[in-house]
């Protein structure tokens, strides 16, 4: 596995930059704008693999995306390979309908330490919840970014990531009550501890998430990719584009329903994804917002 191939995949011109916050931010932003957050394998009759070799083959060689356990595993590998001080962490995602965090460790994120200062880096939450810059591991500090204001809070050794969102304007009234729209301005995202993890810690959950009828990943097919101004999302056959801050403190959210033929074209042109097997788009009833 070649780091230069990874750089080419994310469109990053490596000059063997310093191992500083600027380089870390650039790599994160290049990855989230080149590598989609997606679960399409599940809905093409394929599996979501966890081994680094399989992930590299899928994302770098085949120019696909992946879900958090894959895209953040790849990011962890790349940052470690470059010489950053990295720690793999595990997260518990907030379930809005149940009003609680997941009991299982279903999210992978990365801690990076630069000159004694700790940051959280995550390229695998997608949609409008995706951070665009590393977050300082500081409790109670509002950290404004283009997508929203992020806030980390620590209580008794557990960290909580929350998001303060803008208002949103949906010009197409047909979708004004879409179940894909986030209704909360203050949104809990996930919790985590600083206990170091290995990829093996996620194996059972990786299987569960792609096989259980209770999993949102089996309920909905999705693909999400950040742009310099916003984020594209395809959920089932519904395409959305959110433009952050199109007006003061307001996001613009555009919706479009696609035909089966249009889905293939959109995946190729907007997300850069060409599938080897036929996708069966799915928009089940599990809670999932963009």
From Swiss-Prot:
Main localization category: cytoplasm
Residues involved in CoA binding: 103-104, 208
Cited function: Catalyzes the N- or O-acetylation of various arylamine and heterocyclic amine substrates, and participates in the detoxification of a plethora of hydrazine and arylamine drugs.
Catalyzed reactions: an arylamine + acetyl-CoA = an N-acetylarylamine + CoA; an N-hydroxyarylamine + acetyl-CoA = an N-acetoxyarylamine + CoA
Subcellular location(s) of the protein: Cytoplasm
Active site per the UniProt annotation: 68, 107, 122
SUPFAM superfamilies for the chain: Cysteine proteinases
Family indicated by similarity: Belongs to the arylamine N-acetyltransferase family.
Organism lineage string: Eukaryota, Metazoa, Chordata, Craniata, Vertebrata
Descriptive protein name: Arylamine N-acetyltransferase 2
Positions annotated to bind substrate: 106-107
Keywords of this entry: Acyltransferase, Cytoplasm, Transferase
GO MF annotation terms: arylamine N-acetyltransferase activity; N-hydroxyarylamine O-acetyltransferase activity
InterPro entries: Arylamine_N-AcTrfase, Arylamine_NAT_domain_sf, Papain-like_cys_pep_sf
Record-listed E.C. numbers: 2.3.1.5, 2.3.1.118
GO CC list: cytoplasm
């Amino acid at each position: 596995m070649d780091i230069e191939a990874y750089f080419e995949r994310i469109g990053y011109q490596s000059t063997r930059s310093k191992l500083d916050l600027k380089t870390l931010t650039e790599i994160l932003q290049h990855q989230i704008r080149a590598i989609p957050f997606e679960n399409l394998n599940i809905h093409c009759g394929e599996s979501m693999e966890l081994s680094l070799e399989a992930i590299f083959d899928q994302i770098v060689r085949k120019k696909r995306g992946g879900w958090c356990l894959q895209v953040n595993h790849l990011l962890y590998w790349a940052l470690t390979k470059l010489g950053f001080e990295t720690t793999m962490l595990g997260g518990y995602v907030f379930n809005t309908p149940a009003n609680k965090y997941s009991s299982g460790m279903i999210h992978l994120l990365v801690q990076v330490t630069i000159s004694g200062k700790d940051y959280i880096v995550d390229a695998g939450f997608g949609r409008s919840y995706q951070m665009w810059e590393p977050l300082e591991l500081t409790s109670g500090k509002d950290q404004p970014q283009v997508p929203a204001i992020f806030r980390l809070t620590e209580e008794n050794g557990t960290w909580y990531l929350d998001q303060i969102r803008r208002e949103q304007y949906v010009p197409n009234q047909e979708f004004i009550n879409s179940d894909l729209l986030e209704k909360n301005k203050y949104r809990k995202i996930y919790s985590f501890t600083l206990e170091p993890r290995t990829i093996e810690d996620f194996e059972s959950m990786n299987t569960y998430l792609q096989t259980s009828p209770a999993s949102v990943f089996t309920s909905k097919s999705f693909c999400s990719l950040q742009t310099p101004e916003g984020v594209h999302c395809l959920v089932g056959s519904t395409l959305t584009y959110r433009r952050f801050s199109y007006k003061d403190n307001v996001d613009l959210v555009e919706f479009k329903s696609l035909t089966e033929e249009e889905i293939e074209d959109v995946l190729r042109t907007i997300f850069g994804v060409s599938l080897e097997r036929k996708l069966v788009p799915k928009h089940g009833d599990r809670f999932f917002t963009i």
